[in-house]
């Protein structure tokens, strides 16, 4: 039997749906860790085998630690055991509680040019609204945006340490703004915002299609609606307006694409990779 983690059956889209894990102990019941195999039928229902004691335990995705989720990710079996749409809560150091969902598996590129096993995106937005920039400009695009700096400093610092310990640096391609899509920047972030392409699978406001591909969690306008303090609200994407030197692309309160001035205040729904 291989060392690692094993979910007996896949988790559904609910944080309350249980999964089963094999815990490994010495015969004196000293906990060793969890065990995993692609062939779950080789495990006993419980009891001693090969000098160890095994116990079947119930868990939910809400009950998994970020270290356990990271182990699933690094083992290469996360896609078999978790599902797009699985939802988990995060309590920030400010005591604000946010919820994230699995947006996809093996979708994003990390800063070392490997593939991220799991991408999470917030279900809704932070309680506070933010400007993309302090003035009416999108020069430099997401790479130069004030909100990018805020997201990866002030906001990032409010995330719990166990999550920050396993959060990877994600590499995104974003246009440079200035009313043109002639220049594409490489941007490496721990926290980031999805692009118009990643949310809609099209780029009617961005004007260029090189900013990633659609996350399967977004299937229609309803799936793109996000709330600020309990009410549907507009929120930022990381896409600069392709024909406007001062605006960024947003999602409106009905889940439709739109655009607004960079110095306006709107919701922020961040993503990250494990």
Predicted regions and their residues:
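Short, low-complexity N-terminal tether/leader segments at secretion or assembly junctions of large
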Residues: 1-20, 28, 32-35
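Collagenous Gly-X-Y triple-helix signature in extracellular proteins
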Residues: 44-274
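Exposed boundary/loop context
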Residues: 3-6, 26, 44, 246-248
């Amino acid at each position: 039997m291989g060392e690692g983690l094993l979910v007996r059956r896949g988790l559904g889209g609910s944080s309350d749906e249980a999964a089963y894990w094999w815990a490994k102990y010495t015969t004196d019941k000293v906990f060793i860790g969890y065990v995993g195999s692609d062939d779950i039928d080789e495990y006993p229902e419980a009891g001693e085998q090969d000098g160890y004691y095994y116990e079947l335990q119930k868990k939910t995705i809400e009950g998994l630690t970020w270290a356990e989720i990271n182990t699933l990710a690094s083992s290469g079996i996360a896609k078999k055991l978790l599902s797009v749409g699985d939802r988990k809560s995060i309590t920030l150091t400010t005591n604000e509680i946010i919820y994230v969902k699995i947006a996809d598996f093996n979708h994003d590129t990390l800063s070392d040019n490997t593939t991220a096993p799991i991408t999470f995106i917030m279900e809704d937005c932070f309680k506070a609204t933010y400007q993309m920039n302090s003035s009416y400009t999108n020069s430099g695009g997401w790479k130069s945006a004030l909100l990018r700096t805020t997201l990866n400093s002030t906001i990032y610092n409010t995330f719990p340490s166990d999550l920050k310990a396993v959060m990877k640096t994600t590499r995104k391609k974003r246009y440079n703004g200035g009313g043109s899509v002639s220049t594409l920047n490489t941007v490496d972030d721990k926290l980031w915002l999805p692009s118009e392409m990643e949310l809609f699978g099209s780029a009617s406001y961005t004007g260029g299609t090189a900013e990633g591909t659609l996350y399967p969690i977004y299937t229609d306008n309803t799936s793109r609606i996000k709330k600020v303090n309990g009410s549907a609200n507009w929120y930022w994407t990381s896409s600069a307006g392709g024909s406007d030197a001062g605006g960024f692309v947003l999602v409106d309160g009905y889940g439709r694409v739109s655009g607004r001035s960079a110095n306006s205040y709107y919701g922020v729904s961040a993503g990250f990779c494990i």
